[in-house]
Amino acid sequence: MSKRLGIVALVLLVMASCAVVSASELNAVDHGTIIQPANNSEFSQIKPLTVSGSVTQSQTTWQTKVVSAYITSMNVNLYWGNPSNSLQLRIYSPDGSIYGPVYDNYNGTIDGRINLNVLNRAGIPKGTWYYEIYGYSVKGTQSYTI
């Protein structure tokens, strides 16, 4: 009987830790920087980089953005518009922090878009930010803008 209770307790502990991980993904914090879903009506202090690219299944492409001025927020908006395809985004900051992977359902909606705000009251790290876009589940070729 006590062995069964131990197994049940272990299963509940694992399930609880999974729930905590899922909730913490919405506010990934590192070096004071917070990554969170953006409200479509919000704006940031720096205009989003707008470049186009495309990916296929299991292909990785890279984009960059240079932050040279002091800012406390930055918007990253990966848009492909086809919710039947799934892209994955990782963000690499100049201070070595890695955020992600982030998927389309990050904000609770599957809409062919990953729209994030990068926030840091002390200032977003200056330098080159790298965006890794990966074709997680793509039929054919999927175009995107970021």
Label the predicted regions.
Residues S54-N105, K126:
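Acidic, Ser/Thr/Pro-rich low-complexity intrinsically disordered segments
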Residues M1-D30, Y131:
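Secretory targeting signatures
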Residues L10, S17-V20, N39, S54, ...:
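Intrinsic disorder/low-complexity segments
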Residues G6-A9, G53, G112, G135:
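Small side chains
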Residues Q88-I146:
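Noncatalytic accessory or regulatory domains flanking protease catalytic cores in secreted, cell-surface
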Residues S24-S73:
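Non-catalytic extracellular/lumenal accessory regions of secreted precursors
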Residues M1-S2, W62, N117-V118:
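A generic local structural motif
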